Amino acid sequence: MLKIGSHVSMSGKKMLLAASEEAVSYGATTFMIYTGAPQNTRRKPIEELNIEAGRKHMEEHGIKEIIVHAPYIINIGNTTKPETFQLGVDFLRMEIERTEALGVAKQIVLHPGAHVGAGADAGIAQIIKGLNEVLTPEQTVNIALETMAGKGTECGRSFEEIARIIDGVTYNEKLSVCFDTCHTHDAGYDIANDFDGVLNEFDKIVGIDRLQVLHVNDSKNVRGAAKDRHENIGFGHIGYKALHDIVHHPQLEHIPKILETPYVGEEKKDKKPPYKFEIEMLKNGTFDEGLLEKIKGQ
C-alpha cells in the first residue's frame, strides 16, 4: 500500500482525531502534524491531545504511522544567541516526549538549523552539540533531519552537511533523514532528470537506510535557486512525471510520503487544500492540467 498523505491540522478540542479525520477526507494513508503552532512554543498538555480517539479513528481507517514536524522556531545551529540555542534544545526534548505519547509516530522532522552568519562549520558544530544534548539511547522516536534548500544561512543544504551532522552525534542511531524534493532540487540536485543518480549519491554519502520520510513538493524555482518555495504537483520546475516516479520508487516503498504543497485560490479566505486531488493524481499516474481549477471549485 502506498503510504501517502499531507500536512494536516491538529487543532480545536478534537486535536489528533481532527487531524485523522482531515487526512481520511483526502484519501490519505498517513499524515504529518505539528503538535501545536509551528511558529510558537505554546503547547496543550499531552492529556488534551485526544490521543485515544485519534488513534481509534486512525486504526479504523488503516493509518498505522504518522509524522511529527518540529516547529520551525527551533534553531540549534545558532552560535550567537545562547538563549535561542537553549530554547531549541529544551523544546526539542519536549517534542520528543509529546511524540512518544502519541504512540503512532516514529519520526520527528527537524530543519537542522541556521548558522546566522557564523559560517556553516560553526553552525554544524552547534547542531551536533544540540543533538548530543537532546538525544538519549532510551528514546523511541527518531529525529529526521530535513534536506534544506540552502536559503539564507541554512545548514543541511547538501548530503555532505547532513552526513557531517550525523557523524558527529553520539547516539546517531536515533537520527534519520527527511528528503524534501523541493529543497533538494533548489539546492542543486537534478531530481527532475536523474533521481536514481541523486539517490545513489545520497546512499554513498549518507546511507539510504537513513531515509525515512519523503516530503513531496514541486518547486516554483529553477534547480539550484536556493529559494525553497513549494509549488503544486506538476506545476513547477520538477514536474509531474519525476514526482510520480519518486513517489512510486521501489527503494522508497516503505517510506511515508508527505505533501506540503500550497493551498489554491486567489484570495487568502478562498484558498482550498489541494491534497485530495494531488494524492489521487499521484496514485492514478496521469497529470491533470485542469487540477488547479478543480481544487478551486471544490
Curated annotation (Swiss-Prot):
<keyword id="KW-0862">Zinc</keyword>
<feature type="binding site">
    <location>
        <position position="215"/>
    </location>
    <ligand>
        <name>Zn(2+) 2</name>
    </ligand>
</feature>
<feature type="binding site">
    <location>
        <position position="146"/>
    </location>
    <ligand>
        <name>Zn(2+) 1</name>
    </ligand>
</feature>
<dbReference type="GO" id="GO:0003906">
    <property type="term" value="F:DNA-(apurinic or apyrimidinic site) endonuclease activity"/>
</dbReference>
<dbReference type="GO" id="GO:0006284">
    <property type="term" value="P:base-excision repair"/>
</dbReference>
<comment type="function">
    <text>Endonuclease IV plays a role in DNA repair. It cleaves phosphodiester bonds at apurinic or apyrimidinic (AP) sites, generating a 3'-hydroxyl group and a 5'-terminal sugar phosphate.</text>
</comment>
<feature type="binding site">
    <location>
        <position position="69"/>
    </location>
    <ligand>
        <name>Zn(2+) 1</name>
    </ligand>
</feature>
<dbReference type="GO" id="GO:0008833">
    <property type="term" value="F:deoxyribonuclease IV (phage-T4-induced) activity"/>
</dbReference>
<dbReference type="InterPro" id="IPR018246">
    <property type="entry name" value="AP_endonuc_F2_Zn_BS"/>
</dbReference>
<dbReference type="InterPro" id="IPR013022">
    <property type="entry name" value="Xyl_isomerase-like_TIM-brl"/>
</dbReference>
<keyword id="KW-0378">Hydrolase</keyword>
<feature type="binding site">
    <location>
        <position position="180"/>
    </location>
    <ligand>
        <name>Zn(2+) 2</name>
    </ligand>
</feature>
<feature type="binding site">
    <location>
        <position position="146"/>
    </location>
    <ligand>
        <name>Zn(2+) 2</name>
    </ligand>
</feature>
<feature type="binding site">
    <location>
        <position position="228"/>
    </location>
    <ligand>
        <name>Zn(2+) 3</name>
    </ligand>
</feature>
<feature type="binding site">
    <location>
        <position position="183"/>
    </location>
    <ligand>
        <name>Zn(2+) 3</name>
    </ligand>
</feature>
<feature type="binding site">
    <location>
        <position position="260"/>
    </location>
    <ligand>
        <name>Zn(2+) 2</name>
    </ligand>
</feature>
<feature type="binding site">
    <location>
        <position position="111"/>
    </location>
    <ligand>
        <name>Zn(2+) 1</name>
    </ligand>
</feature>
<dbReference type="GO" id="GO:0008270">
    <property type="term" value="F:zinc ion binding"/>
</dbReference>
<keyword id="KW-0255">Endonuclease</keyword>
<keyword id="KW-0227">DNA damage</keyword>
<dbReference type="Pfam" id="PF01261">
    <property type="entry name" value="AP_endonuc_2"/>
</dbReference>
<feature type="binding site">
    <location>
        <position position="230"/>
    </location>
    <ligand>
        <name>Zn(2+) 3</name>
    </ligand>
</feature>
<dbReference type="GO" id="GO:0003677">
    <property type="term" value="F:DNA binding"/>
</dbReference>
<comment type="similarity">
    <text>Belongs to the AP endonuclease 2 family.</text>
</comment>
<keyword id="KW-0234">DNA repair</keyword>
<keyword id="KW-0479">Metal-binding</keyword>
<dbReference type="GO" id="GO:0008081">
    <property type="term" value="F:phosphoric diester hydrolase activity"/>
</dbReference>
<dbReference type="InterPro" id="IPR036237">
    <property type="entry name" value="Xyl_isomerase-like_sf"/>
</dbReference>
<dbReference type="InterPro" id="IPR001719">
    <property type="entry name" value="AP_endonuc_2"/>
</dbReference>
<protein>
    <recommendedName>
        <fullName>Probable endonuclease 4</fullName>
        <ecNumber>3.1.21.2</ecNumber>
    </recommendedName>
</protein>
<keyword id="KW-0540">Nuclease</keyword>
